[in-house]
Amino acid sequence: LNHVALTCIDGAMHRYLDEIGYPVDNPVSIQMPVNLRRDDDSDGGNKLGIALVDLAGPAGDRWERHQEIGFKLRNVKNQVFSVPGNSFEQFTIMIAGISEVLEKLGLSDKLPGNGHTVVSNVPGPVRKLYVKGSEVERMYPISTLAPGLRMNITLFSYADVLHFGIVATQDMVSLQTLADYIVEEFRELERERG
């Protein structure tokens, strides 16, 4: 799921950034929450870290980009779990703190970023839900922007349907265009691969 969704988001981001006057010749870098819970971990609560992931470059067909993104995601997981103990959690907290300080000082736009977009995938209910007998037709995620971020794209699954929520800063205009591009990229990937 992540490979397909990120391939569609990647293609859509390149098209969107080009359209609003910020063409990107390199892979788009995103921040991606990573589950840090190990199989033998019996502690309660969430254990998350943020990994920086370079998606695919703008060249190549969708299937090549899909394969490249899948390779990069596997590498990220291997790197995250090769770090001892809770080092990755501590690294995430440190980066978040630095981002907040840079935002407060007004420097976050003047220094190279750590990926100005976060993309997360939140698993939702696998079966339909009902409220007082009425079926809940859709569930959309509501997200926020952490310091240093320009955009947050959250995927939320509900009863075998994937919904996207997109929030961004005011300078990221025409988010509906980005949403339309994500859908178009999915349809094209599906058409190309049958």
Set out the residue ranges of the language-model regions:
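Generic, well-ordered alpha-helical scaffold segments in large soluble proteins
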Residues: 7-19, 54, 72, 76, ...
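Hydrophobic "lid/gating" helix adjacent to the active-site nucleophile
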Residues: 1-42
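Low-complexity, glycine/alanine/valine/leucine- and proline-rich hydrophobic stretches
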Residues: 113-187
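Conserved structured core elements
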Residues: 2-7, 11, 26, 45, ...
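Helical lid/core segments from catalytic subdomains that handle acyl or acyl-like groups
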Residues: 42-125
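A generic structural motif
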Residues: 1, 38, 54-60, 168-173
